[in-house]
Regions:
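Bacterial Sec-dependent N-terminal signal peptides
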Residues: 1-20
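Extracellular glycan-recognition regions
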Residues: 18-222
Length: 222
């Protein structure tokens, strides 16, 4: 029994490799269809990201790519804060999230993001759409919502202009999103559209109308 116990301990401690604390170094941050700056907000070192206003389509590769990341399976954790730009339209929701498994050409990636204005909206339908999964280029939110209503979005409590902790666990074709240290995932996706073997970089993603901030990021590969 002692040998079995020791073996279990070794297995559990080696399931994940060492956690990588992401340092915000400009030479390792590559903006793609966004503007980027390093700032301090509420005492935290953060990356500020705003979508290029000439990009009218939604669910696009509008992110800051972390060039020193190569991610397939594991855990991504980050604190995000979202504000609405002064020129944001009524349909702006504070879209902010994480792109992962980004290919070298930025033409394919998976994504999980949040809509902070929906978290406490006076509409149950909007609350039910506080989180979102999509896969670029073929499975944007509108297609997923039409073909599988409610399956790729869900409710979570959140608001604008406050730090929100996101944790994404990825394993093969499955991804789980946890918000603000929830014990259970608020969104569960069992069929990542790029498949179990996709891998690539991680990106700090925003969409239309958002002034987004990212802080305290760490990545643990499996």
């Amino acid at each position: 029994m002692k040998f079995i116990a020791i073996g279990f301990i070794l297995l559990s401690t080696t399931s994940y490799s060492q956690t990588q604390i992401i340092q915000w170094q400009k030479d390792k941050l590559l903006p793609n269809k966004v503007s980027m700056s390093l700032e301090r907000i509420n005492g935290n070192e953060a990356v500020r990201v705003v979508k290029d206003s000439t990009i009218k389509e939604v669910d696009e590769p509008t992110f800051v790519k972390l060039t020193d990341t190569d991610f397939k399976n594991g855990i991504i954790e980050v604190n995000v804060l979202s504000r609405l730009l002064k020129n944001a339209t009524e349909t702006a929701r504070g879209f902010i999230g994480i792109a992962f498994r980004i290919n070298a050409q930025n033409t394919a990636f998976e994504n999980m993001y949040i809509r902070p204005t929906n978290g406490r909206a006076e509409s149950q339908l909007r609350r039910n759409r506080a989180t979102q999964y999509f896969s670029f280029p073929d499975f944007k939110f509108d297609r997923l919502r039409k073909e599988a209503p409610g399956e790729y979005e869900s409710y979570a409590d959140m608001a604008l202009n406050e730090w929100i902790h996101l944790r994404i666990e990825v394993n093969g074709k499955q991804a789980k999103l946890y918000v603000n240290h929830s014990k259970q995932p608020v969104l569960l996706v069992n069929d990542l559209k790029l498949g179990a073997d996709a891998s690539g970089a991680i990106g700090l993603w925003v969409d239309v109308g958002t002034e987004g901030f990212f802080s305290d990021m760490k990545v643990t590969k499996r």
